[in-house]
Design a protein with these regions (language model features):
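Extended, compositionally biased low-complexity polar/Lys-Gly-rich tracts
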Residues: 1, 6, 258-262
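Aromatic-lined substrate-binding rim segments of carbohydrate-active enzymes
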Residues: 2-85, 103, 107-118, 215-231
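C-terminal substrate/ligand-recognition segments
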Residues: 259, 280-283
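Acidic-and-aromatic substrate-binding clefts and catalytic sites of carbohydrate-active enzymes
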Residues: 1, 21-33, 58-60, 134, ...
Length: 283
């Protein structure tokens, strides 16, 4: 297959999707055998490789050790790891990176991946975060209520939001004035979960957008600490500029500033063609 890609179809680069849940099946155990086989063949064929570093699929052993780290929606329901339409290995939508054990485990996987693949001449670039967005929100985009698309309401994310508010407003009095509330302490502040006022929603989404930006920075810095040669790339949905950002919680322009190469996914025939086409409708 790779020979046909290189010689018959004249491609010069391929993409590999490296799933955390598949490559790290047990604590401290990594199996990159299949990845290295492909890379070795690409070395011989002169093909370059765009390596997808996918931590949106967390290992089941990690969920078992830290069930409290599951994403939580606005209704208070936690999201168990499962398969998804684009991911047959399971582990979706990963676990919340606001929990230190989860972030540490993800960093270990990214470092180990970079250590192994960076030895190969065919290794060209990392897809640091495939179509970045708040993962469970994206997966539920077409088949859930708004409450079930809003994340994350786990205790660590709420605590981080409270700290962010403290840094933003300085005093509880200033926050209470801006939000038209009378809070007795920072600890009782809960993010908005349904229709209500605007200013608390704006702050909550600003916080989540900053959180996504910092997660991208974490991924970039972790990979770059091991591999100083390969390009760091990411890309958004083709319609990223008009995504429901309140749900996806990203600022593509902020994310792009962290990357060496930035792009987008574009599938002209995917889902509803008029949505991604400038062609006018016929009468």
């Amino acid at each position: 297959m790779l020979q046909a890609i290189a010689n018959e179809y004249k491609f010069n680069i391929i993409r590999i999707y490296c799933s955390w849940v598949y490559l790290n099946p047990e604590p401290g155990k990594f199996d990159f055998t299949e990845i290295e086989e492909v890379l070795t063949d690409c070395d011989l064929l002169g093909l370059k490789v765009l390596m997808g570093a996918v931590i949106e699929e967390a290992p089941y052993w990690l969920e078992a050790a830290h069930p409290e780290s599951r994403f939580v929606d606005a209704l208070g329901e936690s999201q168990r790891l499962q398969t998804a339409s684009i991911n047959m290995s399971g582990g979706w939508p990963s676990l919340c990176m606001d929990w230190t054990p989860i972030r540490d485990a993800a960093a270990t996987f990214l470092r180990e991946l970079a250590r192994v693949v960076s030895r190969h001449p065919s290794m060209y670039a990392y897809d640091v975060w495939n179509e970045p967005h708040l993962e469970p929100s994206g997966g539920h985009e077409f088949n859930a209520s708004t409450d079930q698309k809003l994340y994350c309401y786990c205790e660590k994310t709420i605590a981080s939001f409270q700290s962010w508010l403290k840094q933003r407003y300085g005093t509880l009095e200033k926050l209470s004035e801006a939000w038209v509330r009378r809070y007795p302490s920072w600890e009782v502040i809960d993010p908005p979960r349904g229709p209500g006022s605007y200013i608390d929603w704006v702050d909550w989404r600003r916080f989540m957008i900053e959180r996504s930006t910092e997660e991208m920075r974490f991924r970039v810095q972790t990979l770059r600490a091991v591999d100083t040669r390969s390009i760091l790339e990411s890309h958004v949905f083709s319609q990223a500029a008009i995504l429901p950002l309140a749900l996806q919680a990203i600022n593509p322009w902020r994310l792009a500033e962290l990357m060496e190469t930035w792009g987008l996914s574009y599938f002209p025939r995917c889902r509803n063609p008029p949505f991604t086409s400038a062609r006018p409708k016929s009468n």
